[in-house]
Amino acid sequence: RVPSLLEERNESQADSLRSNPELLATHQRIERTEFDTLMSVAARYYRLVFFDSGNDESAERWLRMVDSSYQLVIPTLAAPEPAESAALLLDALRERDERSRDLADSAIVVVTESEPRGPAAAERVADGFRGTVREVLRIPFDPALKSGPLRFDSLRRATQDAWLRVAAAVASGF
């Protein structure tokens, strides 16, 4: 039954259980027990389970995702407003409970250059997180990140290398 719920595999060979992009989020909410069931099934079949939590940190599923996590990767763009949102999220986690504080302190922040402005803005944002999380990594601007489905082989070599550094940072936490 689980394979029938998964997105069709593509070149990445990754299975994906995702929301329906043709429906509003309000029609696809899952609650605590549903999340726990999904996590239980996923953990039975997969050694690594990744969640793209969205940005509704007040949602029950978001809190359960945090409670089920061993590593947080906090993405942000190289701009003040998204960086402030990421910083506020980390602050809220630190205030939530001891486990959430530990997750925030050991988080990896990924700062992506969404426009071809050069690395200065990304470096300023990255500097704001250094010393507050385990690691801060930058992803250079790459037009392939803005042009439809992501494919690793369509990224520039520098972007591929940057994402490999992110993966290595995540792996070093285990």
Task: Map each language-model feature to its residues.
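Short glycine-/polar-rich loops that comprise or flank the Walker A/P-loop
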Residues: 68-71, 102-107, 132-134
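Short acidic catalytic loops
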Residues: 47-57
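Inter-motif core of Ras-like GTPase G domains
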Residues: 44-46, 59-80
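NTP-binding/hydrolysis catalytic cores, primarily Walker-type P-loop NTPases
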Residues: 147-174
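Acidic-aromatic/histidine active-site loop/patch
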Residues: 3-4, 92-98, 105, 170-174
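Conserved beta-strand segments of the P-loop GTPase G domain that flank and frequently precede/overlap
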Residues: 24-26, 50-52, 74-78, 108-113
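Beta-strand-loop-alpha "switch" segments that mediate conformational coupling across diverse proteins
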Residues: 113-157
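P-loop/Walker-type NTP enzyme "switch/lid" segment
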Residues: 1-44, 147-150
